[in-house]
Amino acid sequence: MKKRKRKSKTVQADTPDGQRAGEAIIEAVENQITDSNPPETRETLERLMAMGESRENAMRYIASVLSIEIFEAMKNKTPYDKERYLLNLANLPDLPYE
């Protein structure tokens, strides 16, 4: 069985589906940063990097927070909670589920 080449060194999932999902989340974070929507995403990236995190790790932190928001919205069938997302970004590197 061939090992699948990973497209992103930021995402290192164990399964192809997990890899695709992780890459989609990273792409969403990249879009938020590029579009400055919300601007707090870029600010969080810059803050984490200023604290000594690599860009990859900072992106992983932000992606974790976005993943939680997506999961909560799907699980509870509720809209995206921007206030909670921004609060969780502000609290990084402390993760919401720790």
Predicted region positions:
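Structure-specific DNA junction-binding interface
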Residues: 1-98
